[in-house]
């Protein structure tokens, strides 16, 4: 005997994209446990984040910024979301993936310092700081041009030079493209961060 078909559960109704993001956000308690494996849930969550508009995700980042006393304009928040969301798998990660865009580093990763620092590092960073500071307008393209010019003039090893610059800006070897970081924080802030790192090198 075949059992009669049951009525569809209310939980199976189609959900909008933003609601899906919230439903599968692993940082929020759920009324019913997910049956998906943790890794699969993270991937689904990430897919929702990548499919959502930056504007719809901006409020999650804004909440995390406000909790830390930071109140940027909405356009900045939307831009930050655009930059970092490829690295975000849970909504609560917006701060940890974008902190360096909002506040300068107060310390520098020891392993990265050992990898980047040598007697030429202060001169390298000073040259990069001066090249960036000469820019009259800031964009990823103009910053890239300034960096390439310095590296070509001094024949610095490019990979190590970019890591040294990233360490000065972020405090670790992580984050989005160096050019994108500088274009976001601005020339003056980037210059100050690099100079602070030079002073720390002695």
What residue ranges belong to the model's regions?
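Alpha-helical recognition segments enriched in aromatics with Gly/Pro capping
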Residues: 1-51, 163, 167-173, 196-200
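Generic structural signal for hydrophobic core residues of well-folded globular domains
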Residues: 2, 24, 45-48, 65, ...
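Structural motif
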Residues: 11, 31-37, 71-80, 153-160, ...
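Non-catalytic, well-ordered alpha-helical scaffold segments
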Residues: 18, 38-42, 78, 82, ...
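Short alpha-helical linear motifs
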Residues: 44-45, 64, 102-105, 185-191
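Small-residue-rich helix-loop
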Residues: 54-154
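Charged substrate- and nucleic-acid-binding regions of tRNA-handling and nucleotidyl-transfer enzymes
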Residues: 140-201
